[in-house]
Amino acid sequence: MSNTVTLRADGRLFTGWTSVSVTRSIESVAGYFELGVNVPPGTDLSGLAPGKKFTLEIGGQIVCTGYIDSRRRQMTADSMKITVAGRDKTADLIDCAAVYSGGQWKNRTLEQIARDLCAPYGVTVRWELSDKESSAAFPGFTLDHSETVYEALVRASRARGVLMTSNAAGELVFSRAASTATDELVLGENLLTLDFEEDFRDRFSEYTVKGYARANGAEGDDIDAKSIVSRKGTATDSDVTRYRPMIIIADSKITAKDAQARALREQRRRLAKSITFEAEIDGWTRKDGQLWMPNLLVTIDASKYAIKTTELLVSKVTLILNDQDGLKTRVSLAPREGFLVPVESDRKNRKGGDSNGGIDALVEDYYRRHPEKTPPWKE
């Protein structure tokens, strides 16, 4: 594959870039780039103005599709350096409000809700799942005031145990963490450097999520808080061998199943953050000639230092070209388990409860009236 970097914008082709940085991440729904080059006075730069549509290609393979965000010009008497940056079309979903007539859906799937919210932004939804659980319809789904499209769809995705990301075509993708290993990174061969960090400061032996269940009686009754605070879920981390409990208070009414899923998500998220690999790879392409991209499952072999791992997920990729680093790829990797999304109900839309009142308000009111009964985990 050629390493030629081509920016297509405003019906023109821009090449010859001397500095390149293209980043895509499984934890972000928008890839982004920054390109730089020195140009002589009089160069027409109108096609690189902020707001212009673009397609960025490397060796003919698309790596980013969206809109130019910024253009910077640094000038001397004889030359000018221009730096252009942009993001995928899906960036608008992060920045902008979720707007839909009526603000709610009934008996619609996550895919259908996503298509409705993405349509005004010209963003295509790619659904890569076939299981019944992820495709189950929501009895009801309601937008929060002022939430963005991204925030609304994250909430819906968690309720279906789905990973939401984007691809190089600027599409919003619903998928799951890759399960088949593709490449092996061998230190001293295709792997130039490896930074392996294990940090257990934010990991705990047990995660307990406590929630609220609606008690019998009318609002204003002098009921015992113990009859209200009755739902909980627990997840454990067998790698943390000493006693390190963590308690999380749910922000709304929750079932035991939801509490269990929330505890598991917290355990997995902290696992992924605690064991990380930062690797530098020679070149931009994998063994099959394709560019490095997120959501690939790889192995690392640094046997010289007694490190050999399997099932590491590529969570972030940055393709780099500059005078200091040359041409290389930086990748972030973490255990695949940390990117498995447990199913959580959409608590806001469960019948009889919401996130701005209901049982939460009742509990808080009870403790305001009876501060002596406030449990330690609420102090």
Curated annotation (Swiss-Prot):
Instruction: Identify the DNA-binding region of this protein by residue numbers.
Output: 209-228
Q: How is it modified after translation?
A: Cleavage of the C-terminus gives rise to a shorter 40 kDa form.
Question: What are the alphabetically sorted keywords of the record?
Answer: Host cytoplasm, Late protein, Viral baseplate protein, Viral contractile tail ejection system, Viral genome ejection through host cell envelope, Viral penetration into host cytoplasm, Viral release from host cell, Viral tail assembly, Viral tail protein, Virion, Virus entry into host cell
Question: Which phenotype arises from disrupting this gene?
Answer: No tail is synthesized.
GO BP annotations of the record are: symbiont genome ejection through host cell envelope, contractile tail mechanism; viral tail assembly
Q: Which Pfam families match?
A: Gp44-like_2nd (PF22255), GpP-like_1st (PF21683), GpP_4th (PF21929)
Q: Where is this region: Disordered?
A: 344-379
Regions of biased composition (Basic and acidic residues) lie at 344-353, 365-379
One Gene Ontology CC term in the entry:
host cell cytoplasm
Q: What induces it?
A: Expressed in the late phase of the viral replicative cycle. Expression of late genes is activated by the viral late transcription activator C.
Q: Where in the cell is it found?
A: Virion; Host cytoplasm
Tell me which positions the record assigns to the signal sequence: none
What does the record give as the function of this protein?
A: Forms the central cylindrical hub of the baseplate and plays an important role in baseplate and tail assembly. Core component of the initiator complex that triggers the tail tube polymerization during tail assembly. Forms a conduit that probably functions as an extension of the tail tube allowing viral DNA release during ejection. Might facilitate the interaction of the virus with the host cell surface through electrostatic interactions during virus entry into host cell.
Q: How does it assemble?
A: Heterotrimer of one uncleaved (42 kDa) and two cleaved (40 kDa) forms. Forms a hub-like structure with an inner diameter of 25 Angstroms through which DNA can presumably pass during infection. Part of a complex composed of three DNA circularization protein N, three baseplate hub protein gp44 and three sub-complex wedge (made of two copies of each baseplate protein gp46, gp47 and gp48) that forms the baseplate.
Q: What is known of its domains?
A: C-terminal region forms a flexible domain.
Protein name per the record: Baseplate hub protein gp44
Name the species this protein comes from: Escherichia phage Mu (Bacteriophage Mu)
Q: What is the lineage of its organism?
A: Viruses, Duplodnaviria, Heunggongvirae, Uroviricota, Caudoviricetes
Q: Which gene encodes it?
A: P
